UniProtKB/Swiss-Prot annotation:
A biological process from GO: glycine decarboxylation via glycine cleavage system
GO cellular component: cytosol; glycine cleavage complex
Catalytic reaction list: N(6)-[(R)-lipoyl]-L-lysyl-[glycine-cleavage complex H protein] + glycine + H(+) = N(6)-[(R)-S(8)-aminomethyldihydrolipoyl]-L-lysyl-[glycine-cleavage complex H protein] + CO2
Description of how the protein assembles with itself and partners: The glycine cleavage system is composed of four proteins: P, T, L and H.
N6-(pyridoxal phosphate)lysine modifications at: 715
Role played: The glycine cleavage system catalyzes the degradation of glycine. The P protein binds the alpha-amino group of glycine through its pyridoxal phosphate cofactor; CO(2) is released and the remaining methylamine moiety is then transferred to the lipoamide cofactor of the H protein.
Record field: transmembrane: none
Matches recorded under InterPro entries: GcvP, GDC-P_C, GDC-P_N, GDC_P, PyrdxlP-dep_Trfase, PyrdxlP-dep_Trfase_major, PyrdxlP-dep_Trfase_small
Family: Belongs to the GcvP family.
Phylogenetic lineage: Bacteria, Pseudomonadati, Pseudomonadota, Gammaproteobacteria, Lysobacterales
Protein's UniProt name: Glycine dehydrogenase (decarboxylating)
GO molecular function terms noted in the UniProt entry: glycine binding; glycine dehydrogenase (decarboxylating) activity; pyridoxal phosphate binding
Cofactors demanded by this protein: pyridoxal 5'-phosphate
Length: 993
């Protein structure tokens, strides 16, 4: 008789002695699932690197001064099943009411085909931002559908590929207007009926930039000397205003008109682009994305074509590939922070791609007629309810789309009656209520809403006699969504196959490792994702009364405590919904702290030249002066230069922004000295948390002298990247900065449902539209930390360090690692310097990146932080087999470069310069290259077993930026190319005959 004793090193070890029940109840199963290499592989890789244990390797890499001497004070890890049971108990504490609060958030039905095949599909949610165009054609097509949808519905000429939320988009619109308007005024006028969260973000953004806000009615804006104006259309109370005269007046004085709008409403009412708007922003949430207690949702911005080089966020454009076929790419990237740094149009990096894809597919699935039916039904329900209330003597707004504004009532009593019936209304004040209907509303909902007011609603009878409540002069007459993509995929089979076709074009982590340096593309475990779609998390309105989200409260409190323990900080805000917004929040906290001490003069931010582009861009948004610090030959912060500049700017020094480990992939020995220098001159130390995956369980920034960090839950703590968002960028601070974390909106909190303030008045405004940012994906990080436990988190960090050093060591005979730390080791990533190879062969880092596609790999980070290099970050989730596959590909590529050097391959017509190679090219009747098809497509034998074929050849970036087109490709563009190719084949066959 025998029993399973234990699992060891991937092999089942048998013992003839009975194991204890405690041994069989193995709690470390998830850790072994998350960490790629098993113990045998770890031992083998350690031998390659030259160490006998993870502990000895960690001691060799991490400076002793900053190493944690005690384990994380977190519980032991638990199994997936136990964690799911535990979070189910938390979720059940939330109470899902029917929410008619509105204020920018509306109920929606997520089509199940989109839920299963986009939101729950790792082919979509594990992809990265589409910097590598050739392996991102599928999601870029989905995003260009999103851009076309937004541009069509708003009546504008161009739209971006998503922003973080509507309020952030409005703040970006204000900045765009300031940059682009002819007026030199510093005054920005804000409609007094914008959503409250939008006004809060405008206030946060305006003050550091020297912009003066004035809030008032559209009539008051007629005579204002402004550089821009923001209108809400329909407004937060549901009114649909005619703003044509105002738009003309603003334009006459050199200002720009920005409008916050609603995509569903714009199917019925005149789009802002047709009555004078220059910029339109909004939220696509009601196109199939749940409330999620505030997010994530895809905001958007559309504008006139003349502002395309100033619009923030990513733009998908159309170019051509090397074969002349249409191909998508990121357009006009020189606007963005990773290139323009403090001169960028915005600090935005991560946006909301996954949610934009969902919204675009909602429009594709329903098409223009389906959207019209949803919009008219929503409006009809609102009109019927309004008629019933008016019939009972209540005062309701005259014109509206979906939102009723009821005045002159006992709002408290009615609000309480609605809550007792399981419904949430918007209480504006003691005498005013708002009711916003949506596509989920039923006839019984309308009857129940009437009963709350003591009114009997006969839906059928009222439908027969009630007129619509849209203003006749503002009805939409223009067509929208006319492209075939919105008029083809309306059956589930058609959409299912369209989604599969798009996903098959791309490389995501369900196919291959994505070794992007500074991006931490680690496992997004399925168990972590499961709670996200539970209705107890997905269906809570962000402005619901606090008694309805006690489960969220517990989860948020526990996650904040976990993150504080991992970082050594004292307080956390989960409001920032991207890393860039976390940076922004941290710098605002520093700014407010200095001002609270009467040191307004402190506005200089020191930033190393190696920093991520969001650092200087965020500092600029806070009104800070950016001063660059040099790096030494080893890639470290030049301490002498730092000391000199800290002394020079001693009276005005606000902060130092430093990434740790550095963006050069090393643990700098002088980090504590760096912090001391900055503190000695009155500054605060901001540690960018982008590389926190090298620190968890090993070192805590809050303990070595750092005052504030942002974290990337979409990197270190396993929220998926989603192809470019969502993300969560918590701001973590020491105690003295805690009072300066972002404020929150008042929420209905007492028994009567009256708005109440928090226990402490915040001194810094909101940085995201919702109090807890992208709250519905916080369960992902909670699950990860809970399942890993203290020991698992430390081991994950150690294996991340090991994997990076293993790659560097194995590639050392072939590629130089640009920077190393102590003992010739790197941190969790390494920079491969291919510049010497380019000098002798002409092969660039970009050529290597494109060639890796032929091997089935997403490229490492290209030309950051050093131009002409490749930065590799494998993370702890990749097995030795996958690491070896990558190493073998890189060695093969080095061999091809050597063949060019020796003259065995042509300097131009070689597989690197011509990469990537499509199936169409390889199988064409003619092969015009000086190398074989086999070398092009199957440079390694393993590729015969599993081969990824890129859908396009190398994309022409120059053509794309010279011929900017950011909407769906006309079908004729494909047809013309196909016709010409067919004609060529006919002629070729004829010549053979």
């Amino acid at each position: 008789m025998f029993s399973v004793s234990h699992f060891c090193s991937g092999s089942l070890m048998m013992s003839h002695t009975l194991s204890s029940l405690r041994d069989l109840e193995y709690q470390g199963a998830f850790v072994e699932r998350h960490i790629g290499p098993n113990d045998v592989e770890i031992a083998q890789m350690l031998r390659v690197v030259g160490y006998d244990s993870l502990e000895s390797l960690t001691d060799a890499i991490v400076p002793e001064k900053i190493r944690s001497t005690v384990a994380l004070d977190l519980p032991k890890g638990i199994t997936e099943e136990e964690a799911l049971a535990k979070i189910r108990v938390i979720a059940n504490k939330n109470r899902v009411f029917r929410s008619f609060i509105g204020q920018g958030y509306y109920g929606t039905h997520t089509p199940k085909v989109i839920l299963r095949n986009v939101l729950e599909n790792p082919a979509w949610y594990t992809a990265y931002t589409p910097y590598q165009a050739e392996i991102s054609q599928g999601r870029m097509e989905a995003l260009i559908n999103f851009q076309t949808m937004c541009a069509d519905l708003t009546g504008m000429e161009i739209a971006n590929a998503s922003l973080l939320d509507e309020a952030t988009a409005a703040a970006e619109a204000m900045s765009l207007a300031k940059r682009s308007a002819k007026s030199r005024s510093d005054l920005f006028f804000v409609h007094d009926a914008v959503h409250p969260q939008t006004l809060e973000l405008l206030r946060t953004r305006a003050e550091p930039l020297g912009i003066v806000l004035r809030v008032g009615t559209p009539e008051e804006a007629l005579q204002a000397d402004v550089f821009g104006i923001l209108l809400q259309y329909p407004d937060t109370f549901g009114r649909i205003g005619d703003h044509r005269v105002l738009a003309d007046a603003v334009h006459a004085r050199g200002g720009l008109v920005a409008v916050a709008s609603d995509l569903l409403a714009l199917t019925l009412i005149t789009p802002p682009g047709e009555w004078g708007a220059d910029i339109v922003v909004g939220n696509s949430q009601r196109f199939g994305v749940p409330f999620g207690f505030g997010g994530p949702h895809a905001g958007f911005m559309a504008c006139r074509d003349i502002y395309k080089r100033s619009i923030p966020g990513r733009l998908i454009g159309v170019s051509v590939d090397a074969a002349g076929h249409p191909a998508y790419r990121l357009a006009l990237q020189t606007r963005e922070q990773h290139i323009r740094r403090e001169k960028a149009t915005s600090n935005i990096c991560t946006a909301q791609v996954l949610l934009a894809v969902m919204a675009s597919m909602y429009a594709v699935y329903h098409g223009p007629q389906g959207l019209l039916r949803i919009a008219w039904r929503t409006h009809r329900m609102a009109a019927i309810l309004a008629a019933a209330l008016r019939g009972a003597g209540l005062t309701v707004g005259e014109y509206f789309f979906d939102t009723l504004h009821i005045v002159g009532i006992d709002a408290v009593a009615i609000h309480c009656a609605a809550a007792a019936a399981g419904m949430n209304l918007r209480m504006i004040d003691n005498a005013q209520l708002g009711i916003s209907l949506d596509e989920t509303v039923t006839r019984s909902d309308v009857v129940a809403l009437g009963q709350v007011f003591g009114v009997q609603v006969d839906v059928e009878a009222l439908d027969a006699i009630t007129a619509d409540a849209l203003p006749a002069g503002l009805l939409r007459s223009s067509a929208f969504l006319t492209h075939p993509v919105f008029n083809t995929h309306h059956s589930e089979h058609e959409l299912l196959r369209y989604l599969r076709m798009l996903a098959d074009k791309d490389l995501a982590m369900d196919r291959t490792m994505i070794p992007l340096g500074s991006c931490t593309m680690k496992l997004n475990a399925t168990a972590e994702m499961i709670p996200v779609t539970w209705q107890e998390f997905a269906c809570i309105h962000p402005l619901a009364p606090a008694v309805q989200w006690s489960g969220y409260r517990q989860l948020i409190d526990e996650l904040e405590a976990m993150l504080a323990e991992c970082t050594g900080y004292d307080a956390i805000s989960l409001q920032p919904n991207s890393g860039a917004q976390g940076e922004y929040a941290g710098l605002l906290a520093i700014r407010a702290y200095h001002r609270s001490r009467g040191e307004e003069r402190r506005n200089v931010c020191l930033i190393p030249e190696s920093a991520h582009g969001t650092n200087p861009a965020s500092a600029q948004l806070c009104g800070m002066q950016v001063v660059i610090i040099k790096c030494d030959r080893s890639g470290n912060v030049d301490v002498d230069d730092l000391r000199m500049k800290a002394e020079k700017y001693s009276d005005s020094l606000a902060a130092l922004m430093v990434t740790y480990p550095s963006t050069h992939g090393v643990f700098e020995e002088a980090i504590t000295e760096i912090c001391e220098i900055v503190h000695a001159h009155g500054g605060q130390v901001y540690t960018d948390g982008a590389n926190m995956n090298a620190l968890v369980g090993v070192a805590k920034p809050g303990r070595w002298g750092s005052d504030v960090s942002h974290l990337n839950l979409h990197k270190t703590f396993c929220i998926p990247h989603g192809g470019g968002g969502p993300g969560v960028g918590p701001c973590a601070v020491k105690a003295h900065l805690a009072p300066f974390l972002p404020k929150t909106l008042p929420l209905p909190g007492d028994a009567a449902g009256l708005p109440v303030q928090g226990t402490q008045e915040a001194k810094v405004g909101m940085v995201s539209a919702a109090n807890f940012g992208s709250a519905s994906i916080l369960p992902v990080s909670w699950m990860y930390i809970t399942m890993m436990g203290a020991a698992g988190l430390r081991k994950a960090t150690q294996v991340a360090l090991l994997n990076a050093n293993y790659i560097a060591k194995r590639l050392a005979p072939h590629y130089k690692t640009l920077y190393t730390g102590r003992h010739g080791l790197v941190a969790h990533e390494c920079i491969l310097d291919v510049r010497p190879l380019e000098k002798v062969s002409g092969v660039s880092a970009e050529d290597i990146a494109k060639r890796l596609i032929d091997f089935g790999f997403h490229a490492p980070t290209l030309s950051f932080p050093v131009a002409g290099t490749l930065m590799v970050e494998p993370t702890e989730s990749e097995s030795q087999q996958e690491l070896d596959r990558f190493v073998d590909a890189m060695i093969q590529i080095r061999g091809e470069i050597a063949a060019i050097e020796k003259g065995h391959l042509d300097p131009e017509d070689n597989p690197l310069k011509q990469a990537p190679h499509t199936a169409v090219q390889v199988m064409a009747s003619q092969w015009g290259h000086a190398y074989s098809r086999e070398l092009a497509a199957f440079p390694l034998g393993v590729l015969h077993h599993a081969k990824y074929w890129p859908p396009v050849a190398r994309v022409d970036n120059v053509y794309g930026d010279k011929h900017v087109m950011c909407a769906c490709i006309p079908v004729e563009a494909y047809k013309e190319k196909e016709d010409s190719e067919i004609q060529h084949l006919i002629e070729e066959d004829a010549s053979r005959c």
